Amino acid sequence: MIASKETKEKIRNFIGGFASGAASTLAGHPFDTLKVRLQTEGSTGRFRGLAHCFTTTIKEEGFFALYKGVTPPLLGMSIINSCMFGAMNIVKSKIHTDKSTPISLGEIMVSGAITGWIVSFVACPIETVKSKLQVQYTGVKLYNGPIDCIKKIGIRGLYKALIPTGFQRNSLYAYFGCYELAQRYLRREDGSMTMGRSFIAGGIAGTGFWLTNFPFDVIRSRIMTMPYNESPPRYKGMIDCAKHIYRVDGLKGFWKGFSPCLLRTFPANGATFVAYECVMKFFPM
């Protein structure tokens, strides 16, 4: 039985997403580790800024400490991106029903927002494990690795940050919207995109994504990295966490870790779309 064109397109999107997730993780994980550490240090002031966080981490824990927690996202981001591109393709096909006309920017952005909430159910547990492992410093460790972490926190712990993750991932409207806009300006006269142009468009998409959701990402990181055995829990929920951040650090607290995030976003998201477009190119319909 020969697969239909629609089925082949779905499979191709899932494969492209898987490859893009691996590329994104390898390119951006060190910056992500610095981001999470700066976001979750609270009022203790462990680090004086991005440069100090980087040098302290290397000095105390070695270079590969920047890749702490990389196992879950290496596999996890591949799964997340696979679901993201696959779901985006399906949602777009449901929203844009008139195939005789090109899909509009508005339809792409609405599709991205819906996709964000769908993907949150996959992203939340994976990123919770990653974040918990990233903030383990030298000394006593709560978790011996991803499996031990999952066993200790359970299903409830894996999904504790689902709501802020949903709001954060909702910004896929900006991600895919910015990528589409960038493509329109960067395409060559024949309509094609080189790998370099795809990389730039991906970097722009990533920048748009983070600019529109970073405060939610800070809240999400705080909730994700709470010790599983803490009683009573530090935060009762997303709103309580937001109030605590504002009370302690003011508005600037919602932008902690933004510098490494911006440094990470171009290489990571550029690599994401280059890998994705390569799969689309080498596995034609």
Swiss-Prot record:
GO MF terms held by the record: L-ornithine transmembrane transporter activity
Keywords, in A-Z order: Membrane, Mitochondrion, Mitochondrion inner membrane, Repeat, Transmembrane, Transmembrane helix, Transport
Organism for this UniProt entry: Dictyostelium discoideum (Social amoeba)
Source lineage: Eukaryota, Amoebozoa, Evosea, Eumycetozoa, Dictyostelia
Mitochondrial intermembrane-side positions: 1-13, 91-102, 178-198, 278-285
Protein name: Mitochondrial substrate carrier family protein L
Lineage top rank: taxon: Eukaryota
Subcellular location: Mitochondrion inner membrane
Membrane-topology annotation of the record: Multi-pass membrane protein
One Gene Ontology cellular component: mitochondrial inner membrane
Solcar repeat positions: 8-94, 103-185, 193-282
